C-alpha cells in the first residue's frame, strides 16, 4: 500500500499527544460555541480510537475535562508550562462568545488533528477546513489584538454592574468592541484581582437572589447594602411580615429608617424575644365584620386550616390552654350571632350528629358546636358584633356571650392572600396539627371512617398532641419483601413493586417501548415529538429532560456535588463518580465476550469490540 508517507513514522507507537491539537488562551477565547463543540468531539474520538486499538495510556486531564463538558482554554501539547503563569486569573475565566454560530474567528491549521478512522477523519477534517476558510481576511495577528479598554474606567463596582447588565450592542461599533467592553465592565464589577473565584460567585448569587425578591422588599434590602448572601438572608428573615399598605424605606443610611417608619416600629423586625409568653392572639389574624362577609367558602376553609395549624404549633412548643372538661362539653342554647360558616352537607354532618352524649364522643365526631365551644379561649377578636343569620341555614358556629361576645370562632375560613407573623422560636417546616388523618384500621384490616367529614377533624385541646403523635409514631410504613426498602407513601411503594415484577404498563404508541411510570413515558415521547421544553438561560441550549438541564447548569455554576471519598476529587454527575471510583477499586465490569479482556467503561468495550469485527472483515 503506497501512502507516500515515510515508513519511519510508524516505528514508534502513536501517543495521544500525536493526535491532539493545542490552543493558546487567546486562540481558545476566540472560538465560538460550534467550534468548541467540534473540537471536543474530535479530541474524544481520537482518545477512543487509541483505546480501541489496545493502546494502553492513562486518561489525560484534558479528556476528563472534555467528558465533564468543562470550558478549556488549552491543551498541554505544544504549550510550555509557564504559558499561564503570566496570565492573571481573570483572563483564565471562560467567556461566553457573543458571536453567532458559524462565523469563523480564526484560521487554524487543522492538519495536526489526526484520527485513526479514515472514514470519519476525511469528511470531518474537510468540514473543519471549510469552516475556517470562509473568511480569508482573518489572521492570527489580527485576532491576537489586545482588548480595548474603556475610555472612562468605572471605579464604582455597583455602577459597573449596572452598566454591564444594561449594555446594548448598539453602543459600540462592532462585535469585537462589544466583547471587549463587556469584559472590561465585568472585571470592574467583580474585581478579579482582589476577589477569589468563590467571592465572585457569591456576588453573582447575591445579585440573582435580590432580583428574585418582591420589589418593596428588594429595595429595602438593597438600601442596607449587604456584602454577601448570608447578610441578605438575615435581613429578609428579620422582616417577618409586611402588610400590603406599608412601604419599605428606600433611602437613608444603612440601619436607619425614615421618620414615617420610625413612628410605627411594631411592623419592623425586633430581634429580641418578647419577655411575656406568646399567646394565640399574638399570632392570630383578625377580620372585621365587613371583611369576613367578603370571604368565600374556600377562603374561610383555608382560614380555618391556618388558624388551627397555628394553634397546633403553640401546643407543640409547650403552650398550655385554659380549657377544662366543662368547656369540652357542648352547651345547649340558641345559636349566637356569628359569621356564616356552614359545614358541607355532602361531608355527612347533620344536626343530629352534632350532639353526641359525651364529650369524648363529641370530639371524635367533630360536632361543630363542641369545637366552637372548645376553641373559645383561642378565638379572634372582632370589633363589632356579627350580623344575625336567617333561620333554616346549616349548623353554624356559636359565639360566646359576655366578655367573649363579638369574637369570631375558628370555624372554616381565610383569605388566599394572607399575611402571617413568623415567630423565630417556632421550628420551621413543622407540619400543622390539623391534617387529614388516615382512616382507622379495623380488626380485619379494613378502613373505618371516623365520622361523616371524611376523616378531617377540627382540633381541640388534646387534638394537636394526638395528631403529632400519629404523624411521627403511627405512620404506616410499607416494606418491600424483595429488597427490604421501606416507603411511607403507598403510591411510591406500588411503583417500586413493578421493578421486581417487571410490569411496564405504559407503552409508547410510536415505538412500542414500555415504562414503569407514566412520567417516564411522557419524557420518552419527547424524543418522537422533538419537544425540548427546558431551556438554559445562560447559553440557550434546550433539553427534553429536567435532570439533563440540571446537570448542564452545573457547567455554568461550577458546582460539583459528588466528591470522591478516597482522593477528594469532585464530579458534576454521580455516574462520573462511580466511573472514577473504579480507578481506586480496580473494578472492570465490562468484559469482552470474544477474548475476555475487561474494561472500566462501556465505551472502551464498544471500541474494543470493533477490533474483532475489523479482523473478521480482513479474513473474508
Curated annotation (Swiss-Prot):
SUPFAM superfamilies registered for this protein in UniProt: beta-beta-alpha zinc fingers, KRAB domain (Kruppel-associated box), Retrovirus capsid dimerization domain-like
GO cellular component: cytoplasm; nucleolus
Compositionally biased spans, kind Basic and acidic residues: 343-355
Primary location class: cytoplasm
GO molecular function, one term: DNA-binding transcription factor activity, RNA polymerase II-specific
Residue segments, region Disordered: 324-370, 382-458
Domain KRAB intervals: 14-85, 278-351
Compartment annotation: Cytoplasm; Nucleus, Nucleolus
InterPro entries given in the database record: KRAB, KRAB_dom_sf, SCAN_dom, SCAN_sf, Znf_C2H2_sf, Znf_C2H2_type
Keywords: Cytoplasm, DNA-binding, Metal-binding, Nucleus, Repeat, Repressor, Transcription, Transcription regulation, Zinc, Zinc-finger
Zinc finger extent (C2H2-type): 478-500, 506-528, 534-556, 562-584, 590-612
Signal peptide annotation: none
Domain of life from the UniProt record: Eukaryota
UniProt domain SCAN box: residue ranges: 161-243
Subunit annotation: Interacts with SETDB1 and TRIM28/KAP1. Interacts with ATRX. Forms a complex with ATRX, SETDB1 and TRIM28.
Family designation: Belongs to the krueppel C2H2-type zinc-finger protein family.
Primary role: Probable transcription repressor. Specifically binds to the 3'-end of zinc-finger coding genes and recruiting chromatin-modifying proteins such as SETDB1 and TRIM28/KAP1, leading to transcription repression. The SETDB1-TRIM28-ZNF274 complex may play a role in recruiting ATRX to the 3'-exons of zinc-finger coding genes with atypical chromatin signatures to establish or maintain/protect H3K9me3 at these transcriptionally active regions.
Descriptive protein name: Neurotrophin receptor-interacting factor homolog
Organism: Bos taurus (Bovine)
Gene: ZNF274
Amino acid at each position: 500500500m503506497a501512502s507516500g508517507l515515510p515508513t519511519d513514522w510508524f516505528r514508534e507507537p502513536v501517543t495521544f499527544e500525536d493526535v491532539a491539537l493545542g490552543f493558546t488562551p487567546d486562540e481558545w477565547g476566540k472560538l465560538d460555541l460550534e467550534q468548541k463543540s467540534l473540537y471536543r468531539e474530535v479530541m474524544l474520538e481520537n482518545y477512543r480510537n487509541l483505546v480501541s486499538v489496545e493502546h494502553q495510556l492513562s486518561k489525560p486531564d484534558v479528556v476528563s475535562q472534555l467528558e465533564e463538558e468543562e470550558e478549556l482554554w488549552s491543551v498541554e501539547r505544544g504549550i510550555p508550562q509557564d504559558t499561564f503563569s503570566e496570565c492573571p486569573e481573570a483572563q483564565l475565566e471562560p467567556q461566553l462568545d457573543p458571536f453567532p454560530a458559524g462565523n469563523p474567528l480564526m484560521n487554524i491549521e487543522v492538519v495536526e488533528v489526526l484520527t485513526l478512522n479514515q472514514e470519519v477523519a476525511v469528511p470531518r477534517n474537510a468540514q473543519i477546513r471549510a469552516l475556517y476558510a470562509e473568511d480569508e481576511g482573518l489572521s492570527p495577528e489580527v485576532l491576537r489584538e489586545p482588548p480595548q479598554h474603556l475610555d472612562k474606567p468605572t471605579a464604582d463596582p455597583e455602577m459597573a454592574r449596572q452598566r454591564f447588565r444594561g449594555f446594548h450592542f448598539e453602543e459600540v461599533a462592532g462585535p469585537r468592541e462589544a466583547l471587549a467592553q463587556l469584559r472590561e465592565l465585568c472585571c470592574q464589577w467583580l474585581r478579579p484581582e482582589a476577589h477569589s473565584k468563590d467571592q465572585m460567585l457569591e456576588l453573582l448569587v447575591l445579585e440573582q437572589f435580590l432580583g428574585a425578591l418582591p420589589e418593596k422588599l428588594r429595595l429595602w434590602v438593597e438600601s442596607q447594602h449587604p456584602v454577601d448572601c448570608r447578610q441578605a438572608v438575615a435581613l429578609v428573615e428579620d422582616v417577618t411580615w409586611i402588610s400590603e399598605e406599608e412601604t419599605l424605606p428606600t433611602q437613608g443610611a444603612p440601619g436607619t429608617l425614615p421618620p414615617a417608619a420610625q413612628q410605627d416600629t411594631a411592623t419592623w423586625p425586633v430581634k429580641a424575644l418578647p419577655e411575656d409568653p406568646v399567646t394565640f392572639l399574638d399570632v392570630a389574624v383578625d377580620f372585621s365584620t365587613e371583611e369576613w362577609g367578603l370571604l368565600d367558602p374556600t377562603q374561610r376553609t383555608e382560614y380555618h386550616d391556618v388558624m388551627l395549624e397555628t394553634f397546633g404549633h403553640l401546643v407543640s412548643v409547650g403552650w398550655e390552654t385554659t380549657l377544662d372538661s366543662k368547656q369540652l362539653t357542648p352547651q345547649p342554647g340558641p345559636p349566637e350571632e356569628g359569621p356564616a360558616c356552614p359545614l358541607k352537607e355532602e361531608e355527612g354532618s347533620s344536626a343530629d350528629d352534632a350532639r353526641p352524649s359525651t364529650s369524648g364522643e363529641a370530639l371524635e365526631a367533630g360536632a361543630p358546636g363542641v369545637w366552637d365551644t372548645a376553641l373559645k379561649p383561642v378565638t379572634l377578636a372582632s370589633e363589632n358584633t356579627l350580623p344575625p343569620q336567617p333561620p333554616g341555614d346549616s349548623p353554624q358556629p356559636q359565639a360566646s356571650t359576655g366578655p367573649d361576645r363579638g369574637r369570631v370562632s375558628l370555624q372554616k375560613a381565610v383569605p388566599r392572600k394572607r399575611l402571617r407573623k413568623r415567630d423565630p422560636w417556632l421550628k420551621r417546616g413543622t407540619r400543622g396539627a390539623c391534617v387529614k388523618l388516615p382512616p382507622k384500621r379495623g380488626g380485619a384490616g379494613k378502613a373505618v371512617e371516623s365520622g361523616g367529614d371524611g376523616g378531617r377533624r377540627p382540633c381541640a385541646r388534646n387534638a394537636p398532641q394526638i395528631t403529632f403523635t400519629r404523624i411521627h409514631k403511627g405512620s404506616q410504613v410499607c416494606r418491600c419483601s424483595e429488597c427490604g426498602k421501606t416507603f411511607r407513601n403507598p403510591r411510591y411503594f406500588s411503583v417500586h413493586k413493578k421493578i421486581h415484577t417487571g410490569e411496564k404498563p405504559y407503552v409508547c404508541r410510536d415505538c412500542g417501548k414500555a415504562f414503569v411510570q407514566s412520567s417516564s413515558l411522557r419524557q420518552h415521547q419527547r424524543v418522537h415529538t422533538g419537544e425540548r421544553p427546558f431551556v438554559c438561560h445562560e447559553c440557550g441550549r434546550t433539553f427534553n429532560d429536567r435532570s439533563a438541564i440540571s446537570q448542564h447548569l452545573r457547567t455554568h455554576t461550577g458546582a460539583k456535588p459528588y466528591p470522591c471519598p478516597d482522593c477528594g476529587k469532585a464530579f458534576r454527575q454521580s455516574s462520573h463518580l462511580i466511573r472514577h471510583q473504579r480507578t481506586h477499586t480496580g473494578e472492570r465490569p465490562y468484559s469482552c465476550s470474544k477474548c475476555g479482556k475487561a474494561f472500566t467503561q462501556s465505551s472502551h468495550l464498544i471500541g474494543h469490540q470493533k477490533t474483532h469485527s475489523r479482523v473478521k472483515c480482513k479474513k473474508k
